[in-house]
UniProtKB/Swiss-Prot annotation:
Record's protein name: Iron-sulfur cluster assembly 1 homolog, mitochondrial
Effect noted on mutating residue 60 to A: Abolishes iron binding and abolishes interaction with CRY4
Subcellular location per the Swiss-Prot or TrEMBL entry: Mitochondrion
Amino acids binding Fe cation: 60, 124, 126
Transit peptide: 1-15
Record's keyword terms, sorted: Iron, Iron-sulfur, Metal-binding, Mitochondrion, Transit peptide
UniProt GO molecular function: 2 iron, 2 sulfur cluster binding; metal ion binding
Species lineage: Eukaryota, Metazoa, Chordata, Craniata, Vertebrata
Family statement: Belongs to the HesB/IscA family.
InterPro entries: Fe-S_cluster_asmbl/transfer, FeS_biogenesis, FeS_cluster_insertion, FeS_cluster_insertion_CS, HesB-like_dom_sf
């Protein structure tokens, strides 16, 4: 389990229209910028083996993703290994992430992980919560 309940960084979600769910090797794929950012975040945290993605009930649309550092793989976690990065998906979040791409986006005002999810039926205005 993660040693801290605080999130790693801010994350938002985007509904991806006109995209069919396609079988992939993993429930979640990472863009090169997401891989690079996770490596940067873990560089100074040798006691942590990766990040864990979870889902919580909150926000104006029902569900929201969480990101935490983790020291180990939980018994029911799904592990995604890509380009030397380990991402663990909590059991409760596994079905909500099928076919999802995890990206890291920076602009002049903000930086955040973005989950491009083809399964989402709706999001709130700020993009932090969603429903499936």
């Amino acid at each position: 389990m993660a040693s801290s309940a605080s999130s790693v960084v801010r994350a938002t979600v985007r509904a991806v229209s006109k995209r069919k769910i396609q079988a992939t090797r993993a429930a979640l794929t990472l863009t090169p910028s997401a891989v690079q950012k996770i490596k940067e975040l873990l560089k100074d945290k040798p006691e942590h083996v990766g990040v864990k993605v979870g889902v919580r009930t909150r926000g104006c649309n029902g569900l929201s993703y969480t990101l935490e550092y983790t020291k180990s793989k939980g018994d029911s976690d799904e592990e995604v290994v890509q380009d030397g990065v380990r991402v663990f998906i909590e059991k409760k979040a596994q079905l909500t992430l099928l076919g999802t791409e995890m990206d890291y986006v920076e602009d002049k005002l903000s930086s955040e992980f973005v989950f491009n999810n083809p399964n989402i039926k709706g999001t709130c205005g700020c993009g932090e919560s969603f429903n499936i």
